[in-house]
Amino acid sequence: KDTKYWSYEQQELGFNYRMTDLQAALGRSQLQKLDKFINKRNLIAKRYYDLLHGMPIKFQKINKKAISSFHLFIIRIEKSVNISHEDLFTKLRKRNIMVNLLYSPIHLHPYYRRLGYKKGMFIESEEYADSAISLPIFPKLSIKDQKFVAKSIKEILH
């Protein structure tokens, strides 16, 4: 089977909500840094907005009354662009930019296909999955690296 390395499939329905003691201790220690991490990620997100403004992409909408943690920074390629998100992904990865494709529509996973779900039943989720790319975002992302990401996207999309 020809599987792309970013893809994943749900073969079975299952849950695992257990957290180890070590994970709990690590999580508790990280809470002290949470505000700093969120502020830094918000600065990086704002810089992405500024650097990518005017490009044929859509940004994730953020409620003005909320503060996003920007766990991810997702852009969506507009339909007017003559490049697929997979091609953009591949070209950015060739430049050593660690972008990701996320959120494969769950109704297209084998488990749900066996239940009768098929392509075309949830068009918006399919369109989202076919256009969304997660850009690098982490507290220590340098301005230089972020500018390189933005410059690369501009070069590829134009």
Predicted regions span which residues?
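Active-site region of PLP-dependent enzymes
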Residues: 1-72, 107-110
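Conserved PLP cofactor-binding pocket of PLP-dependent enzymes
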Residues: 1-5, 47-51, 87-120, 127-133
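A secondary-structure boundary/capping signal
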Residues: 27-30, 102, 137
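Short, solvent-exposed alpha-helical surface patches in well-structured domains
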Residues: 40-43, 87, 148-149
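Short hydrophobic/aromatic beta-strand micro-patches
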Residues: 74-78
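Internal helical hairpin/lid segments
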Residues: 79-87
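PLP-dependent enzyme catalytic core of the Aspartate aminotransferase-like
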Residues: 81, 94, 113-158
